[in-house]
């Protein structure tokens, strides 16, 4: 059976030297449920990355953001799908977001990222962005 390809975008949002990290809900496969990620989501057919990222953060966090430059991209193969994860430099006018689709959120410095249990794709992307 051929694996499904997913195009996913994520936001790198900083407040000074700290970056926003979000924890996934307790749903989906064990290898991603409750793991940490950079906020974002899937790109729908007919959307560009910028539209998808703004839509996802509005739907999942009731938060309006500005999507800036592309920072990097990785491809990762999970047991039942392949994800292409692309990060964008984003800005928010405030920190007034809601956790509508996440368990938790925190602001960490890159050297603190190892404290969290990241999805494999996000861990690979973080390694690339903060090498």
Residues of each region from the PLM?
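Conserved N-terminal beta-strand and adjoining loop/helix that marks the start
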Residues: 1-20, 42
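Active-site-adjacent beta-strand/loop module that shapes the phosphate/pyrophosphate-binding cleft
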Residues: 15, 64-66, 74-96, 106
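Conserved Nudix-box catalytic region and its N-terminal flanking loop in Nudix hydrolases
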Residues: 18-59
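A generic structural micro-feature
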Residues: 2-5, 32-35, 79-84, 99
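Short secondary-structure boundary/capping segments
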Residues: 3, 11-12, 27-29, 75, ...
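NUDIX/MutT-family hydrolases
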Residues: 89, 98-129
């Amino acid at each position: 059976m051929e694996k499904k390809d997913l195009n996913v975008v994520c936001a790198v949002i900083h407040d000074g030297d700290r970056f926003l990290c979000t924890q996934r809900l307790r749903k989906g496969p064990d290898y991603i449920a409750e793991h940490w990620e950079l906020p974002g989501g899937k790109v729908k057919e007919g959307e560009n990355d910028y539209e998808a990222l703004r839509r996802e953060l509005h739907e999942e966090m009731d938060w309006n953001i500005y999507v800036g430059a592309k920072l990097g991209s990785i491809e990762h193969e999970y047991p039942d799908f392949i994800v292409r994860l692309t990060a964008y430099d984003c800005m928010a006018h405030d920190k007034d977001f809601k956790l509508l689709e996440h368990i938790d959120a925190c602001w960490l410095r890159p050297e603190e990222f190892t404290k969290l249990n990241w999805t494999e794709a996000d861990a690979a992307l973080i390694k690339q962005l903060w090498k």
